[in-house]
């Protein structure tokens, strides 16, 4: 809105500031931070007055967080508001990529809110039916994938080269095309086209198959990252801290993809218009840092599924839009480890239970719970259980585990960016 207003002001002093992505991103980030801190305090007081708080804290199911029963939840509403307001004010609302991010926020925000509402007000600890969540994630994935396929505004320049001519750097771009090219790390040519996998289908059909694969992959990425973030949200400040770091890395990657100079330097696809994601992700990071003011240990509010599902979806969709989805296993390494730990633990336990052994890989999952669980706690609930990797007997404090996980995410985020130059 403000962006459009400044465009109308034309050549008035200061009006051209709004044409700079860096300026709008900084303003959006600061606005998100301030709104999150201010609204967080107001929201916490409101939830306490309405007695809207965590109620599902069973000592057998969640022995660590029994003391947190009564802490206000659904704080993800604050994060969403602190993201949307700066974006609506500072963003170019006609940009297709920004519109997709706003749709992502609203769809997953509604899904998460419905889940939290059922848990809090209906007393149903299962929350929203799992199939409804999956249906929502599939729908979002289809919207994103099909928009990237059919919107005339979604194009890319697969190659950008530069040379010096009369002491001036001249950039030459390949024709704007729709493409299923993506960036893959650790190879000489960073660009890989999904359509090439289906070359055996012929020149025409391989592109159709490539787009079908891309849409399916988009659905998978949306579901996987949003669920990974949801699993990571188990300690005070954990999900918000990790996601803020990932958000900063995505700001860098989006800026590179939307800037012709840096696209040439890093030899990645130039995606016109994707620089608008820098504004959105800046408000995303600002909102999360502001939320940490209240969510850091000891938490005064929880984000709930309203926050975690939305956060994960935003990360996944942003990566898909800038064609950096293959950097997500590294960038979101913590989310990946949390998800894999739950899947492996569940399958191994079921498999061994049928054979009368009752075996676990870790003491408890998601993985962050392993480091604050003692063998005594495991054996108290399951006396015959064996743990393959019990780890050290000394337990770690919640705040220390969060710090360690955030440091790991910081290292992984730096490595993900560095892969653009490692070939």
Residue ranges and their predicted role:
Residues 41-59:
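Membrane-interface helix-loop junction between the first two transmembrane segments
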Residues 57-71, 125-132, 136:
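Juxtamembrane helix-capping/reentrant segments at transmembrane boundaries
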Residues 59-68, 123, 199-207, 264-272, ...:
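Short juxtamembrane and helix-loop transition motifs at transmembrane-helix boundaries
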Residues 18, 69, 185-210, 268-278:
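Short aromatic-rich membrane-water interface segments that cap or initiate transmembrane helices
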Residues 2-44, 81-110, 137-182, 213-423:
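Alpha-helical transmembrane segments
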Residues 50-52, 123, 306, 353:
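Juxtamembrane helix-loop transition segments at the membrane interface in multi-pass membrane proteins
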């Amino acid at each position: 809105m403000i962006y459009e207003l400044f465009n109308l002001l034309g050549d008035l002093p200061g009006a051209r500031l709004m044409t700079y992505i860096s300026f709008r991103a900084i303003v959006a980030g600061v606005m998100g931070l301030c709104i999150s801190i201010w609204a967080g305090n107001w929201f916490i007081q409101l939830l306490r007055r309405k007695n809207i708080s965590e109620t599902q804290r069973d000592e057998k199911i969640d022995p660590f967080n029994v003391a947190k029963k009564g802490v206000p939840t659904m704080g993800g509403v604050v994060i969403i508001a602190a993201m949307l307001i700066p974006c609506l004010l500072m963003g170019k609302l006609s940009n297709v990529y920004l519109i997709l991010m706003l749709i992502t926020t609203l769809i997953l925000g509604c899904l998460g809110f419905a889940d939290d509402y059922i848990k809090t007000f209906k007393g149903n600890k299962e929350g929203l039916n799992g199939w409804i969540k999956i249906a929502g994630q599939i729908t979002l994935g289809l919207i994103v994938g099909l928009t990237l396929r059919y919107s005339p505004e979604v194009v890319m320049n697969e190659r950008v080269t530069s040379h010096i001519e009369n002491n001036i750097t001249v950039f030459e771009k390949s024709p704007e095309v729709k493409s299923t090219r993506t960036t893959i790390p650790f190879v000489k040519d960073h660009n890989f086209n999904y359509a090439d996998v289906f070359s055996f289908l012929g020149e025409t059909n391989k592109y159709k198959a490539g787009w079908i694969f891309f849409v399916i992959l988009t659905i998978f990425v949306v579901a996987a990252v949003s669920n990974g973030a949801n699993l990571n949200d188990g300690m005070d400040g954990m999900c918000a801290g990790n996601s803020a770091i990932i958000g900063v890395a995505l700001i860098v990657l989006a800026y590179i993809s939307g800037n012709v100079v840096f696209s040439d330097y890093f030899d990645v696809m130039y995606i016109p218009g994707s620089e608008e994601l820098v504004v959105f992700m800046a408000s995303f990071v600002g909102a999360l840092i502001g939320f940490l003011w209240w969510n850091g240990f000891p938490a005064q509010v929880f984000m709930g599924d309203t926050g975690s599902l939305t956060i994960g979806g935003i990360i996944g969709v942003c990566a898909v839009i800038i064609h950096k989805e293959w950097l997500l296993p590294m960038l979101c390494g913590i989310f990946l480890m949390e998800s894999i730990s739950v899947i492996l633990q569940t399958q191994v336990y079921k498999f061994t239970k049928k054979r009368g052994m009752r075996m676990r890989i870790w003491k408890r999952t998601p993985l962050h719970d392993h480091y604050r669980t003692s063998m005594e706690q495991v054996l108290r609930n399951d006396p015959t259980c064996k743990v393959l990797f019990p780890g050290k007997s000394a337990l770690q404090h919640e705040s220390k585990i969060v710090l360690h996980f955030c440091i790991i995410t910081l290292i992984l985020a730096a490595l993900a960016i560095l892969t653009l130059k490692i070939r």
